Amino acid sequence: MSTPNPSADLLERLFKLSENKTSFRTEVLAGVTTFLTMCYIIIVNPLILSETGMDHGAVFVATCLAVAIGCLVMGLIANYPIALAPGMGLNAYFTYSVCLGMGVPWQTALAAVFISGLIFLAISFLKIREAIVNAIPMSLKFAIGGGIGLFLALVALKNSGIIVANPATLVGLGDIKQPTVLLSLLGFLMIVVMHHFRIRGAIIISILVITAISTFMGLNQFKGVVGEIPSLAPTFLQMDFEGLFTASLIGVIFVFFLVDLFDSTGTLVGVSHRAGLLVDGKLPRLKKALFADSTAIVAGAALGTSSTTPYIESASGVAAGGRTGLTAVVVACLFLACLFLAPLAQSVPGFATAPALLFVGVLMIQGITNIDWEDITEAVPAFLTIVFMPFAYSIADGIAMGFISYALIKLLTGKAKTVPYMVWIVAVLWAFKFAVFGG
């Protein structure tokens, strides 16, 4: 007669390992795999957000804690093998469009993220979420993802020095002979090759290798690997709600909300499909999964980071056998352990993380192949959405142009009845904003 194992019984009750045909060992391996593919965020996110004036160490801690909170809620309440972290694209929008582009203080931008999280939390328990998602044309959904990909690419090329400002042509090619530029190109090639051969952790490996090479060449100062946990005080509860509800910042809140809505829904369904967790094409416990996402957004903003969202890198853990929330809990524990790695994160230069941004841009733009380019009434709004994001240096303006042009072109071509009501509402609101308040 076997001796009862209280720990095993607890894990079975919490995560239903047997029912999901998995084991403790498999779930831990899946969690480690997911962690390796997404841990680059603890380096990239503080670098991006610190450009707004936010304290690097505090953002590092906020990033680790936001990931841990999101993953714990996802694992323990929703029981899905899906990890969450500050979204790439949303952090770039926060820094380069909202704070640096619009001149919004980072404290106010955090308040916008917080409000968007509360809105997301509210609709997580209502049926309007599906109505909103389904009301947005597929061409615009894919175009938004592709446009953000190009926006990230432009940021990456700028940060690496590959693209520089040029008074005559707006932008131009930088000095390719510069060591930092060459190292960025090397880092990008490393990621591409490792990704091709399905080497887990390709992005973080590239970042660490380029950091090591640059330190050896004297281009960067190495500050160590392990150290004390930085203070969270500089960003904790520093949200400033005064002046938040202006026309321009309401648009910012809308963009944070809309992009995360698409991101979370698409990732949750996509990863769950790969794991075989969908029932009749739908995701059981969807409300609990969205609750985890919105909780992470609200908590992250309070701690001091931009919007948190489910990570597509979770698919790597699913491929390794992850089927339950135990995978997400393992990811949470590993990110908490990373709190002691602040010196390493502070040692990484911007040109070492630029390849990661560029590669994420590659992944995000792949969805534009699903746009119906033969239908000009679908193609033009999608195209405008994509190109306005990098050229106007604003994700919000890209979304605005997409919605306005979609409604207008459908109206002028006699297809007004095919336009979802949500598109009309958003298009009119953006048009009013531009007409009254300008860009």
Positions of PLM-derived features:
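Membrane-interface helix caps of multi-pass small-molecule transporters
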Residues: L47, L72, L76, S97, ...
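Residue-level signature of catalytic and energy-coupling elements of molecular machines
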Residues: V28, I48, I132, G201, ...
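Juxtamembrane transmembrane-helix boundary signature
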Residues: A68-M88, I119
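Hydrophobic/aromatic residues within the transmembrane alpha-helices of Major Facilitator Superfamily
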Residues: V32-C39, I69-L72, L76, L157, ...
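Membrane-embedded alpha-helical modules
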Residues: M102-F216, N220, V329-G439
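Helix-loop-helix hairpins and the membrane-proximal interhelical loops
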Residues: S2-A58, V171-L173, I204-K287, W430-F432
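Helix-loop-helix junctions within the multi-pass membrane cores of secondary transporters/permeases
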Residues: S7-N45, A66, G87-G145, H273-I368
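Loop-to-helix transition at the N-terminal end of transmembrane alpha-helices
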Residues: G53-L72
